[in-house]
Amino acid sequence: MSTTARRRLMRDFKRMQQDPPAGVSASPVSDNVMLWNAVIIGPADTPFEDGTFKLVLSFDEQYPNKPPLVKFVSTMFHPNVYANGELCLDILQNRWSPTYDVAAILTSIQSLLNDPNNASPANAEAAQLHRENKKEYVRRVRKTVEDSWES
């Protein structure tokens, strides 16, 4: 069945293959274009550098008019990531636009890694450390990076 959402997701996948953004990759699971696996590489010169962070993107038939549900599968210590891996990111909620595609979602998440929004914390401990004790915050993030290599 070819729906608007499925056609759009196939176009997003084709674009990801033809013009992949630096440091991110994603593709649908083999038998379901509505469910994607993704990887974000931690940006250079940040505490997340060299991390390999896995995510899952779940789309429904309302995509692209409705954003996907995006969750980190990898453990993530970050002010804008809940304990269950879900993100607090404006473009996945009230700032969503149908013009965003999978590449834009992943590059936005990648830039959020080093530029958290402390005004909207999903992880209060990470937000507090980011504001008040950068050294401990970086130590915890580096542990997350090391853990990402094993998962």
UniProtKB/Swiss-Prot annotation:
Chain ranges of the UBC core domain: 4-150
Gene3D superfamilies: Ubiquitin Conjugating Enzyme (3.10.110.10)
Any GO BP annotation: chromatin organization
Keywords associated with the record: ATP-binding, Chromatin regulator, Cytoplasm, DNA damage, DNA repair, Nucleotide-binding, Nucleus, Sporulation, Transcription, Transcription regulation, Transferase, Ubl conjugation pathway
GO cellular component entries: cytosol; HULC complex; nucleus
Protein EC: 2.3.2.23
First and last residue of the signal peptide: none
Catalyses which reaction(s): S-ubiquitinyl-[E1 ubiquitin-activating enzyme]-L-cysteine + [E2 ubiquitin-conjugating enzyme]-L-cysteine = [E1 ubiquitin-activating enzyme]-L-cysteine + S-ubiquitinyl-[E2 ubiquitin-conjugating enzyme]-L-cysteine
Protein localization: Cytoplasm; Nucleus
Active site: C88 (glycyl thioester intermediate)
SMART domains assigned: UBCc (SM00212)
Pathway it works in: Protein modification; protein ubiquitination
Region spans: Disordered: 1-25
One GO molecular-function entry: ubiquitin conjugating enzyme activity
Similarity field: Belongs to the ubiquitin-conjugating enzyme family.
Subunit note: Component of the histone H2B ubiquitin ligase complex (HULC) composed of at least brl1, brl2, rhp6 and shf1.
Function field: Catalyzes the covalent attachment of ubiquitin to other proteins. Component of the histone H2B ubiquitin ligase complex (HULC) which plays a role in transcription regulation by catalyzing the monoubiquitination of histone H2B to form H2BK123ub1. H2BK123ub1 gives a specific tag for epigenetic transcriptional activation and is also a prerequisite for H3K4me and H3K79me formation. Also involved in postreplication repair of UV-damaged DNA, in N-end rule-dependent protein degradation and in sporulation. Required for obr1 ubiquitination, which regulates mating-type silencing.
The protein, known as: Ubiquitin-conjugating enzyme E2 2
